[in-house]
Structure formats: structure tokens, C-alpha cells
Amino acid sequence: MAGIVNLVRSSARSCALSCIVCLAISAPSQQLPTAPQPRQKLPQDGPARPKRVGDQACVPCHEAYSSSYLHTSHHLTSQPASGNAILGSFSGSGSTLKILDPIPSKSSPGLSFHMEVRDGGYYETATVGLPGHEQSHSERIDVVTGSGTRGQSYLYWLGDQLFELPLSYWADGHQWINSPGYKDKTANFSRSIYPRCLECHATDIVPRSSDPLTNHYDRASLVTGISCETCHGGGADHVAAHTATPAIAPSTATILNPARFVRDRQVDLCALCHSGGKRVELAPAFSYLPGQPLDSYLQPAPVDPATLPDVHGNQVGLLQRSRCYLSSPTMSCSTCHDVHAPERAPAAYSDRCLRCHSVQSCKMSQTIGPKIADNCIDCHMPRQPTNAIIVKTAGNAVHTTMRTHWIRIYPEVAQPQ
């Protein structure tokens, strides 16, 4: 039998788990789970929604930035479903995940998932039961979430309701796995997707209710991916001004430029999605405006100096512990990250380190040799296992690794390479 695979994400920000019956197909058409009550009542109305024009309106004047940004993980963090967007296999043995073999002598039903291309779409199908008595349930993939760097999960529409599908794609293993937080040996199609779940994977969507735990939306309002207007604000006035008067000088009067924010507001913009999952919502999802204090939107999480934040989703909290950050009044996320470019190579980040540090100042430079200049981060920002994303295969738990943003000396990894 194929190895049983499970992915678990433990985070207060993760979507609440729905009721799951072991070895039964749970579909929203049968019975929706009861959502937990919100921790506090949010304001009925947030700030006026930005007047958006879409990324294509930025291209005529900002072609270089726009062309590069299309390939970044932020832009690709959600997409409409397509053959190019979905990374997993839909053919041969790679399209099937067998969870349990049926055992007729024990009346133990089997469970398997199959990924299919049919009727012009991409489908997840769960089949459960004993031979000759199987039951199947299929749903079409409508939205892809995740750039694929670590993996992808998939969503589907049922009327105006949005749900997560039970299988996700795990990039490190190049295989289908149970979706984040799903119990193994189940086929659950009824996990609701709430606005806060979407906020870090999409630019906008309009809920049909002020309840923070709704999953009813205006489907046509979904703007996938993190777009230009997520960080620069609505661009309608900016485009209108420059269309009417092409020679007008660039101005912050009609558009937001995070590079001109004070350091704390720059970091707040990133912290919206990179400061952990324990911050309580104070305002409706998608109402945060770049340049405003994040603490007025999300309640600050309690800080325990004795507890190290997990490397998953806590980049800002880890960075703020770093001597580099504490000793500089200007260092921000953009000091090292070019948000408009798809950068992954260690040499690119090491180049940023060398703007303030020298190779000679590193005590390991003589031991490691010249190549140290191209790879500061493996020693000072090593990959560490996360407890938020765990992959279980046939009894073995594999912790996905992510690069820590606590920049410091790690003696255990500072060895000759």
C-alpha cells in the first residue's frame, strides 16, 4: 500500500477545521460544519474599499517592474485554476493517492483520491468503500493557492461559498498529500475558507456578510494574487491623473510608495502576513491600508522572550530579534528583499549582507575560504524545521524547513562546507 501522507499546519490564523467523520466523505451539499464563534465582534464597516484598476494598468509606465513581478511568489500566491497553475500530476500513478486499502474480512473500507482532467476542468475525486460498494465525490478546482515554492492547496466554489479541497501538492516530495490541517484517513470537502484565510493569498474579495467567519462572497470580486495595489493602494486616481496629463511629475498624492514610509510602517506592510498567526483581528479582512499602523488592524501578539517564534510565518518577529535590525534605524524587509523580483539564490542575499559587513570580518572566512562571500545566509540564516507544516509518511514525520529570519551566529552550522 502506498505510504499514508498527511500535512498538518497548526496556526491560530489557519482556517478552522470542520467536522470530520472518519472514513466518510464530508461534503457541504450534505451538511455544513458549525463555524466557531468569532473571538470578538468586528466593526460592521471598514474603510472605503480602494478604487482599483488592476495590474495591467501599471504596465504602460512601469513595464520593467510589472514584467518582473509577474514571476514572484507574491504574485503567484493565488491564481485561477489552469494546467499551468496546478503543479501536481494528473496522469498515471502520480495522479492517485491511496490512503487505505479495503479489507473486506474486517468490513474496513478503502479510501483513495484521484486527480482528473475532464469536462474542461481539473477535479479532485475521493472514493471510499468496499469493492463493489464504493462511493465517490468530486469537486472542480477553481482557485489555486500557494506559489508552489513549498506547495499548493486548492479551493472550489459551491454557489457563492468557498471551500478547500482535501488534497494539496507538496513541492519537496513532488506528490499529492492531505491538505493542511486535515486528518488522515478522511475525505473532507467542507472546510470553509474565511476572509482572513484569503487575505494573504489574494488582493481582494468582497464578503457578503460582516461575520469574520463567513465563506459567502461576491465571486466576481475576487482579485487573485498579491497585486501592485496590495502595497501601493488603489491606483484609479493615479492612472486617471497620468492619463489626463502624461507629462505630470510622479507624485505620492495619488499613489502610495512604501519606499517613502517610515521604517515601522514599511515593516507593518510585510507583517500583515509575516508576523505569525496569533494576532487578533480588530477590523475586517482586506481593510488594512498600507502606511497605517498595523496595531490598529491586528492586535499585537504577546511577546515571550523565552519562546522562539516558529520559522513559518514569523519572519518579522524573528528579524526584530536580530542585532542587524536592532542596531540600524533604517533596516527593513526591503533592505534584503526586492519585492519586484523573483530572487532565491544565496548570492543575491549575501550581496546585501556585504553592503554592511566584510568577508574579512567573518571569523570563519579563513576556514571556509573565498566561497563564503557568496553564501552568508546558510550560516547566519539557516533553514530550520517548522512545527507549523509537518508531512507524515508511513509513520514518519517530516518537518518542512524554512529559512529563519533571526540573523545571528549559529555555531552548529558554521562549519567548513
Give each language-model segment a name.
Residues L32-D45, R49, Q56, A64-T145, ...:
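Primarily the internal scaffold of c-type cytochrome electron-transfer domains
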